[in-house]
Design a protein with these regions (language model features):
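CoA-thioester-processing core
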Residues: 1-20, 34, 51-56
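C-terminal long alpha-helix characteristic of the crotonase
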Residues: 28, 34-89, 102, 118-122
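C-terminal and late-domain segments of enzyme folds
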Residues: 97-98
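Hydrophobic alpha-helical segments typical of transmembrane helices
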Residues: 3-6, 15, 68-71, 91-94, ...
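Conserved N-box asparagine in the HATPase_c
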Residues: 114
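Well-ordered beta-strand positions
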Residues: 18, 22-24, 30, 39
Length: 122
């Protein structure tokens, strides 16, 4: 599962060992301080679904090229667990595949024409 390996790399040996051995739960504030989470949502429960869907929409069609977002996620998830030179090779491979996509052509055309891109995921 990788929990011990990942947590140790993220928060350090001492804190990871303490948490896993004692079963200590981490507060949202501590998780944020250790960079395990990026944000703490503070709205009320009735607005949660709407706020999450609004936030997620920035990562989906037509607002973002989904292949690019997927490749960024893949590189960021895989990269830290492989040697640096392999991470660079993975990044080059993923970028090369994107440059041949319809979304890349659309992104370049939109930039040149000074308009908002309309990505399709192709």
């Amino acid at each position: 599962t990788g929990g011990t390996a990942r947590l140790t790399r993220l928060i350090g040996k001492a804190k990871a060992l303490e948490m896993m051995v004692t079963g200590e739960l981490m507060s949202f504030e501590d998780a944020h301080a250790h960079n395990l989470i990026n944000h703490i949502w503070e709205g009320d429960a009735a607005d949660f679904r709407r706020d999450i869907l609004d936030w997620c929409s920035q990562f989906t069609l037509p607002n973002k090229a989904t292949k690019a977002v997927g490749n960024i996620k893949r590189s960021c998830q895989t990269g830290p667990e492989i040697p640096f030179e392999y991470h660079l090779a993975l990044e080059r491979e993923l970028q090369a595949a994107l440059f041949n996509s319809s979304d890349a052509k659309e992104g370049i055309a939109a930039y040149v024409e000074k308009r908002v891109a309309n990505f399709t995921g192709e």
